[in-house]
Amino acid sequence: MTTMSTGQSEGTWSITTRVIVYAAIGAALYAVFNWTTFAIQIPGTQNVSIRPHFGLVTFFGFAFGPVAGFLVGFVGNTVGDQLAYGSAFGSWWWSVANGLAGLVAGLFPVWMASRMTTLSSRAMTSAVAGVVGTIVGFLFIWIELIIQPELGFNTILTGEYIPTILGNSIAAAIVTPILVYAWEPLREQLGR
């Protein structure tokens, strides 16, 4: 039985044509969905939007490795910010946080390979990977305490971090396993 991680045969941190192609597809999808949903804000937050498509970041990391996951999150969020706000790097730390979430989710198939022997176990692991990736990756936004100290700890915690990890964790826990269930038969047909 095969595993979902392309990192098993190519190396976890390999940057191959395949990784770049999958990352480009994922980043393009993520950017377009970011652009289409940026106006749907969670009330009482610091411009945190509802993003059910966040599961794309964790899926691409889980399915294609940590490099692809990072690129989908970072590039997709950067391009999405440019499309939505006209400023690709105005909040670069959010793009890095999105990338780190995909990277962390991409490490789970390496760490858990021996436990993912069935499609259902891979799907369940992908949900956990998505939630853990979100919680860990978005810790990076705390750099705002240095960059924008006027926001303060409480605003970052209650207006940004908690709403972001709640919304994105829900999306990752639902969307990532659905995409794993959809991708696995295609992957086997393609011989990937």
What are these regions (language model features)?
Residues 1-9, 185-192:
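Short, charged juxtamembrane terminal tails flanking transmembrane helices
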Residues 26-34, 76, 80, 101, ...:
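Alpha-helical transmembrane segments of multipass membrane proteins
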Residues 38-54, 85-93, 111-192:
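Membrane-embedded alpha-helical hairpins and interfacial helices in multi-pass inner-membrane proteins
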Residues 53-57, 97-102:
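Hydrophobic core segments of transmembrane alpha-helices in multi-pass, intramembrane catalytic enzymes
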Residues 64-65, 76-86:
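Interfacial segments of multi-pass membrane proteins
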